[in-house]
Amino acid sequence: MIQYLKLFLVIFSGLSFLIFGYLCFFSLYFKNEFIRYGIPNFRKTTGFFQSLGGVSLIIGVFIEQLAVIASVGLTILMILGVIVRLKIKDGLLKTMPAIFYAFLNALIFYLFLND
């Protein structure tokens, strides 16, 4: 049962970050959000690491060490996202996705370590 949960969480998070990474490169909304965050120069870098993390999580289904590294990296990335949201005084509703994905990837990390 835990294996199916882990697989679902990895695929869900991996696909989510592939989408987020793509949007960082091509979405006007995301471009404007990074301007609002005060870090417009980090948009493409963030998109790259989100895409890399998403791909690595999915490949990590077969190469577990890669999933462990990706889940740690994405957890850190989302913690940084929470910090940015706090810095610009975004409300809880706008901060919740970053909190959710930070916890999700921390859980994925935990599940791989305790397999």
Where would I find each of the regions flagged by the language model?
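Membrane-interface extramembranous regions
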Residues: 2-115
